């Protein structure tokens, strides 16, 4: 282990020395031989790329186009460090990337996160460790993503599950969580996060799963619908529809980001707060 660390450090030092006395092409060749850089995305490092489009798979209205030269170069620098993989991720893709070369469009699917084989198409599979979508999104002024989105989105749902768990305990109900219609937040929801959330939800209610297509086959459906947000304020309604007992309960969530943390308030069933 120590020998491996020393070897890695020595390699970095050597590259640093070479960088001082040689051109970038020499360093790039070394990186390629070490497997730190790939030639496949070389076409991004040229004027042949007219534009790069990035489309959310969950929110079809969320698509942005990259045409600016420095942004395309940034994309190339990230993808050139992708590692060739043998198998693609088994999670649903979060984005579709299309590289328009004029006479050809190269299409890739991207699973956000460090999941192996998370950038792929029908013929090639790569692992991208960096969040390539954030490089672009962070420069979009119209994005008002709530701070610590994963926490403020999934935490209230888990808290509602804890509230309803006693009434569902020991009942042979098929329970589904429906977030597919939560249009305002779909652009921020990613497969790796859903996997973690589902695991946490199953610890509270074992017979629960995410609704994939239709709610028809479920006895209890928990629907999440955002009612407004900005970076510091968040409101959502979580509806629990028990088809077996013909009941419906709505939990109103109001959260404020203060002193570097979210203060979350969840109402009693069907009691709308005054600040809603």
Feature map (PLM): residue ranges:
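Bacterial Sec-type N-terminal signal peptides, specifically the leucine/valine-rich hydrophobic h-region
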Residues: 18-21
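Function-determining sites in protein domains
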Residues: 24-276
């Amino acid at each position: 282990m120590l020998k491996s660390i020393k070897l890695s450090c020595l390699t970095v030092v050597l590259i640093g020395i070479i960088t001082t006395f040689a051109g970038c092409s020499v360093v790039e060749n070394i990186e390629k031989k070490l497997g730190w850089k790939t030639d496949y995305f070389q076409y991004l490092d040229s004027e042949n790329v007219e534009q790069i489009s990035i489309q959310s798979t969950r929110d079809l209205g969320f698509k942005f186009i990259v045409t600016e030269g420095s942004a395309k170069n940034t994309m190339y620098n990230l993808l050139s460090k992708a590692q060739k993989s043998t198998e693609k991720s088994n999670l649903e893709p979060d984005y579709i990337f299309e590289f328009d070369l004029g006479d050809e469009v190269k299409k890739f699917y991207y699973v956000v996160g460090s999941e192996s084989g998370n950038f792929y198409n029908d013929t090639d599979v790569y692992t991208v460790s960096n969040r390539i979508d954030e490089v672009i999104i962070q420069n979009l002024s119209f994005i008002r993503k709530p701070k610590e989105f994963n926490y403020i989105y999934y935490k209230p749902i888990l808290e509602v599950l804890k509230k309803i768990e006693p009434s569902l305990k020991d009942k042979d109900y098929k329970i589904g969580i429906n977030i597919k219609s939560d249009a305002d937040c779909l652009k921020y929801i990613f497969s790796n996060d859903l996997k973690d959330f589902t695991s946490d939800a199953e610890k509270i209610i074992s017979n629960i799963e995410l609704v994939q297509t239709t709610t028809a086959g479920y006895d209890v459906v928990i629907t999440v619908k955002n009612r407004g947000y900005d970076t510091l304020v968040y409101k959502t309604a979580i509806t629990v529809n028990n088809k077996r007992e013909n009941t419906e309960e709505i939990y109103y969530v109001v959260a404020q980001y203060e002193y570097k943390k979210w203060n979350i308030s969840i109402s009693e069933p069907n009691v709308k707060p005054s600040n809603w």
